[in-house]
Structures are given as structure tokens and as C-alpha cells.
A protein has these predicted regions:
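Membrane-proximal intracellular helices of multi-pass ion channels
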Residues: 1-480
């Protein structure tokens, strides 16, 4: 392990976070929240000083392999979460350090699960920071760093591969740094467009900004106790549309910018993604029709919740925990499906389910006709065995972590649905689950131990498991 270069990269992260903390400080200044302003300025200063101390370490070698990439990624997300939790503790918004860490990790991983029973009494600076963590984490913290800094040659690709939450689009342009800038350009543009649509619907500037942050990062922190239930149908439809748009592979948007419309529309994953959404909306709309006054109202709530869950955003337009069993079962299944690979959404991803389906079809064909060669193809391209193997290993690790987490959080004594959906909601970065962790409830009743388990799940889910598991391997920490 090249410790020096890992620590050097972490110093850049601390510098970036120090700068980003100035934005909620500005919000506190605008609203006259002087104590909160002081806390954000102090936290920013501490982050900058820590960054300066780490930056003094000079790497003797520029060697940067995948293990450095995995270690940097996992440590980076842990570090920004620790620093990001400080304002919650010092302002008294969440005095318990474990609870503050849970809230911050939930923000950066764009999970949106909260321990707070109510948020409307929080200072505006804290509300801004909660939602802004979604926007920072949505594309990936290290992708943001790569868009700003010319790092060592090997670190570009290995960081991009190790940090899975952002789009994997290193083939768009030759330079990885240029790719990162393109990604953030698209990300920023979509955020601004949504912000303008929300303003046009009568939402105030502050609320529009927080909504755009949460939607863009596919995070679910609300700034109202009932999430989006009290907003107009227009606002709910705008949020629905943009949640779904941010769940699309960003490759498609880049192709649209290049006017390669046919190629963008030919993506099997994107087509499957929209097909799943349409099917789920249709089933749920029919199932909940009797609960609402009109078909249009039922359709709106069904579309909102399907878009929210499959993209792993986690906003709610109603208490879907009160829906019929079939509707809730569909939503739970969507928790595992997730959004497209290369989007800001979480979950297992549509592409992996497509690959599993195609691999199953291949195995069935060869079971019936052993001599038949049945290659697996995605978008017309042959899928190599290494990709299939990696997918299988990911699923095995996912099942193991899910089962272990489910058993551990069950020690708190909650019912099975609560425990199952709490793990599903955190490992898939959804936010709300059912029963005691439903859309109008929170995770505050869990013990500190259970919260730590769920914190691990949120990080593992956002980083697609491997970077977090690498931290527990002794071989990864051996020096050269």
C-alpha cells in the first residue's frame, strides 16, 4: 500500500470539503443564524488545517494501483462523513455523535434515511447542508475531485473505477479529467433546469434549491415533515420527472449532446428501466385506485413513488405504508432493482438484472443443447466472462452483507418487516422502508450498534461493496 499518496489524496478531499462548507455558512449568514454560521466556519477551518497537515506528507512514489483506489475511496467517504457530522453535533441539531454520523453518511451516500422525528425546526443552514450533501455525493466525491485537479496518471483511472456511485463513462473522451468535467457539466445543467421548473411552480428559492439538490443526487432528505405530500400536483410531477431523469445512465445524455439519438435510444438498460417504471406504475395505479378520489391522483402518487424508489431517491408524496400489500410489494422489489448503472441512483442496478437474465437464458440453452454456443450480449456487444464473474461475486457479497445486517439489526427487537426494509433501504440507498421506518417515520429508535451496522450498509451500497470490504483485508494494508 502506498500510504503517502493515499494521504495526499485525502488532503485534497479535506480542502474541498472546507470550501464546500462555506456554502451552508453563507445560508446561515443570509438567515441571520450566527451561532450556526460560527459552527460551519469553525468546521471549515478544522477541515482545512487537517488537510494542510496531511498535505505535508510527500509521496516518494507515484504508484497507484486498484488497492490504493479502493482504500482511498472508502477512507474518503468515511472522512468526509466524520467532518460533515461536526455541524450537527456542535449546533445541537443531533447531539449524539453516532446519530450525527448516521445522518451525514445518509446524506453523502444519497440514502436519505433520517433519525430526526421532525426537520421543520432545524436552522436553515443545517437544512441546506443536509440537502447539499446529497448533491455532493450524487456524482461521487472523487469524481468531483478529478474534475478539479490534475492528479497522477495512474490515480485517475483507478479512482474512477473504485468509486462506483458516479457514472462509469471513461470511454466518452480520452482524458479522465475531461470526462469528469463533462459529467459535472451535465449534472449541474440538469440541476439548474429542475430548479427553474420548481421556481415556475411557485416554490420559493430556498426550497427549490434543496429539492433540486436532493433530486439530482437521488437522495431523500426532505425539508418538510411530510416530505412532498403538502406540495402541489405540479411540483410533485416536476420532481417525479427529474427523479426518473437522474436515474438514467449519463452516457445517454452525452450521446444526446453529440446528436447520436439512435445510439442513445438503443441502450437495452435504458429501455428496460423505462419499461419497469411503466409496468410498476400501471400495477400500483390499479391497486391503489380506490384510495383516491380520481384516477389522475392515483396515477400521480403511483408515478411519484415508483420514480422515487427505483431511482433510490426516497422522497414521498404520501404515506405509501398505508397502501395495499401488492403495491408495497412492488415498491420493495424496486428497492433492489435500482436505477441504471452510470446514474446517480443506487440499488443493484438494471444492467446487472439484465445480465443475470441473459446469463440464465444462456445456461438453460446449454443445459438443453450442450453443444450450442450461446454468447451473452449487451447492446450488441459480447459480454466477457470476467464481467459475468464480477457480477456474480458482487451478488454473492451483496447477499452475505444483507443477511448479516438483517440478523444484526434484528437484535433491537423490531418486527421482521421493519428490520428487512431498514436493511434494504440503507444497503440500496433508498431512505424510507416500511412499518417503523416507513415514509412518515424515522430510524431514530434503533440502537447505536444498529445505526453503525446501517451506516456500513449505506457506505457499502453506495460504493458497490468492494471498497468497504477491502478495508478488512490485511493484505490491502501491506507496504510495498
Amino acid at each position: 500500500m502506498n500510504y503517502a499518496i493515499v494521504l495526499r489524496l485525502l488532503s485534497y478531499i479535506l480542502y474541498c470539503e472546507a470550501a464546500l462548507l462555506l456554502l451552508p455558512a453563507m445560508a446561515s449568514l443570509i438567515y441571520g443564524e450566527w451561532m450556526v454560521l460560527g459552527v460551519f466556519l469553525l468546521t471549515a477551518a478544522l477541515s482545512a488545517v487537517a488537510g494542510a497537515l496531511l498535505h505535508r506528507i510527500k509521496p516518494k512514489s507515484q504508484i497507484f494501483y486498484m488497492r490504493e483506489g479502493f482504500a482511498t475511496t472508502a477512507l474518503c467517504w468515511l472522512l468526509i462523513s466524520v467532518v460533515g457530522a461536526v455541524p450537527f453535533v456542535l449546533t445541537g441539531s443531533i447531539p449524539n455523535p453516532v446519530g450525527a454520523m448516521f445522518e451525514t453518511v445518509s446524506g453523502f451516500t444519497t440514502t436519505g434515511a433520517s433519525i430526526l422525528p421532525g426537520v421543520e425546526g432545524l436552522p436553515n443552514g443545517i437544512l441546506f447542508w443536509r440537502s447539499f450533501t446529497h448533491w455532493i455525493g450524487g456524482m461521487g466525491v472523487l469524481v468531483f475531485l478529478l474534475s478539479l485537479l490534475p492528479l497522477t496518471g495512474g490515480s485517475h483511472v483507478n479512482l474512477m473505477k473504485a468509486e462506483s456511485p458516479g457514472p462509469q463513462v471513461d470511454k466518452l473522451v480520452p482524458k479522465v479529467q475531461s470526462t469528469a468535467k463533462i459529467l459535472y457539466g451535465i449534472y449541474f445543467a440538469l440541476t439548474v433546469v429542475e430548479f427553474c421548473f420548481l421556481l415556475a411552480g411557485g416554490m420559493n428559492v430556498f426550497d427549490s434549491l434543496l429539492t433540486a439538490f436532493g433530486t439530482a443526487g437521488t437522495g431523500g432528505f426532505g425539508f418538510k415533515n411530510d416530505s412532498f405530500a403538502s406540495f402541489s400536483p405540479y411540483i410533485q410531477w416536476v420532481v417525479t420527472i427529474f427523479m426518473i431523469l437522474f436515474g438514467v445512465n449519463f452516457n445517454a445524455y452525452f450521446l444526446l449532446l453529440l446528436r447520436r439519438f439512435r445510439r442513445a435510444a438503443s441502450s437495452e438498460e435504458v429501455r428496460a428501466y423505462f419499461a419497469i417504471i411503466l409496468a410498476a406504475v400501471a400495477v400500483i395505479t390499479v391497486n391503489i385506485r380506490s384510495l383516491y378520489g380520481t384516477f389522475g391522483e392515483a396515477l400521480r402518487h403511483a408515478a411519484f413513488q415508483v420514480g422515487s424508489i427505483i431511482t433510490t431517491t426516497g422522497f414521498s408524496s404520501c404515506d405509501f405504508d398505508l397502501w395495499p400489500t401488492l403495491a408495497k410489494e412492488v415498491l420493495v422489489l424496486l428497492m433492489f432493482v435500482g436505477a441504471c448503472a452510470g446514474s446517480t441512483g443506487g440499488g443493484i442496478k438494471v444492467s446487472r438484472f439484465l445480465l443475470m437474465g441473459k446469463t440464465l437464458g444462456k445456461e438453460l440453452k446449454q443445459a438443453l443443447h450442450p453443444q450450442v454456443v450461446a454468447p451473452v450480449r449487451m447492446d450488441g456487444k459480447l459480454v466477457n466472462h470476467e464481467t459475468i464473474r464480477t457480477t456474480n461475486v458482487f451478488l454473492a457479497a451483496y447477499i452475505f452483507i444483507f443477511a448479516a445486517s438483517f440478523m444484526l439489526v434484528s437484535l433491537d427487537g423490531f418486527d421482521m418487516v421493519t428490520n428487512f426494509t431498514s436493511v434494504a433501504a440503507t444497503l440500496n440507498n433508498i431512505g424510507p422502508g416500511l412499518n417503523q421506518v416507513g415514509p412518515m417515520m424515522n430510524f431514530g429508535a434503533y440502537s447505536n450498534f444498529a445505526k453503525l451496522v446501517l451506516i456500513f450498509d449505506m457506505l457499502a451500497g453506495r460504493l458497490e461493496i468492494f471498497p468497504m470490504l477491502v478495508l478488512f483485508l490485511p493484505d490491502a494494508w501491506r507496504r510495498f
